[in-house]
Amino acid sequence: MSQQEIEVILSRHLAEYLAMPIFIVNPDGDLIFYNEPAEAILGTRYSETGSMPASEWATKFQPTDHEGKTLPPEDLPLVIAITQRHPAHKVFWIRGMDGNMREIEVTALPLIGQADRFLGGIALFWERSTK
């Protein structure tokens, strides 16, 4: 495992203490962490999935639009945040590893460190209310 930048270490540490689901990726888009609140929505624990490449996580949860059409990875907010290096937001559906479909809202940001170092991206997301 390569050494992580201090900003990434601190982001992960913060995520561990927040009630908001958070998903963190490195500059290549590889998953490096998601917190316990995210586990409930994704339907699996981080300790069971571990890190995974963007090509895997971007399709593993079967993201679809409101019409049920598969969303390509390049349309996902976190992929936009790391490839275009600007914030992105979207509402879409995923299938958790527990088999349940969930409508989620995602806001993703690029992680930019001191001296403009690109460190990856972070997504905050939540399940939309069905009320």
Q: Which residue stretches match the model-derived regions?
A:
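Sensory modules in modular signal-transduction proteins
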Residues: 2-27
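Conserved hydrophobic beta-strand signature of PAS-family and PAS-like sensory domains
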Residues: 31-32
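N-terminal capping loop/helix in small sensory signaling domains highlighted by a polar->aromatic N-x2-3-F motif
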Residues: 35-39
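PAS-family sensory/regulatory domains
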Residues: 47-68
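PAS/PAS-like sensory domains
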Residues: 70-74, 81-90
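PAS/PAC sensory module
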Residues: 75, 89-93, 100-106, 122
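Output-coupling edge of small sensory domains
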Residues: 109-111
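PAS-family sensory domains
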Residues: 117-128
